[in-house]
């Protein structure tokens, strides 16, 4: 099933835009409104699964927290394991960490050291692509553990912020269902 223009428009219309959130001048794309619509939520998962069902994926990695909401059902439908990447001190077993830059400072992500095996073919899934910093850090974690990442999939791509170009430079192909301007 290839995504039709009508299906993609349905998904786009299910995402509410909130002006001046979280601060003045920002137009926030609220993917939680898509989750409230079971038809839209199911369709978003179906379209991602369709794209990757024959790609040889062995693990799906989702980033905290909304990446879990899309990554886990994609992994389940593909019949592969799901691996969460989380903020520091949220995972109980031994982890490795990767820092990344925020607008005002840095943050860190962690992954269990035994979650990815050398040679795993990994799909990274998140709700939204903006600057690409979170996904870049996630890819570094996966690669440090020997996993191969070639694709990252998103529901929303804020296409004019530059995240896709940033990830393409790291050898990551980006796929998104719904493009929006970032400003």
Swiss-Prot record:
It is an enzyme of class 2 (transferase). NCBIfam families: apt (TIGR01090), PRK02304.1-1 (NF002632), PRK02304.1-2 (NF002633), PRK02304.1-3 (NF002634), PRK02304.1-5 (NF002636). Belongs to the purine/pyrimidine phosphoribosyltransferase family. The keyword GTP-binding does not apply. It comes from Cronobacter sakazakii (strain ATCC BAA-894). GO terms for cellular component: cytosol. GO terms for biological process: adenine salvage; AMP salvage; purine ribonucleoside salvage. Keywords: Cytoplasm, Glycosyltransferase, Purine salvage, Transferase. The lineage of its organism: Bacteria, Pseudomonadati, Pseudomonadota, Gammaproteobacteria, Enterobacterales. It comes from the Bacteria. HAMAP family: Aden_phosphoribosyltr (MF_00004). The keyword Transferase applies. This is Adenine phosphoribosyltransferase. Pathway: Purine metabolism; AMP biosynthesis via salvage pathway; AMP from adenine: step 1/1. Homodimer.
């Amino acid at each position: 099933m290839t995504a039709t223009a009508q299906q993609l428009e349905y998904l786009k219309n299910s995402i509410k835009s909130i002006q001046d959130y979280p601060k003045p001048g920002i137009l926030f794309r609220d993917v939680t409104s898509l989750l409230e619509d079971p038809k839209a939520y199911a369709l978003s998962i179906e379209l991602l699964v369709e794209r990757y069902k024959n790609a040889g994926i062995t693990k799906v990695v989702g980033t905290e927290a909304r990446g879990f909401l899309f990554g886990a059902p994609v992994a389940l439908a593909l019949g592969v394991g799901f691996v969460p990447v989380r903020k520091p001190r949220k995972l109980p077993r031994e982890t490795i960490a990767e820092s990344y830059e925020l607008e005002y400072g840095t943050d860190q992500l962690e992954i269990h050291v035994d979650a990815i095996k050398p040679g795993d073919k990994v799909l990274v899934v998140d709700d939204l692509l903006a600057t690409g910093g979170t996904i870049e850090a996630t890819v570094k974690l996966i690669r440090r553990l020997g996993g191969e990442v070639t694709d990252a999939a998103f529901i929303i791509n804020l296409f004019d912020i530059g995240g896709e170009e940033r990830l393409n430079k790291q050898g990551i192909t980006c796929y998104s269902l719904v493009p929006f301007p970032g400003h």
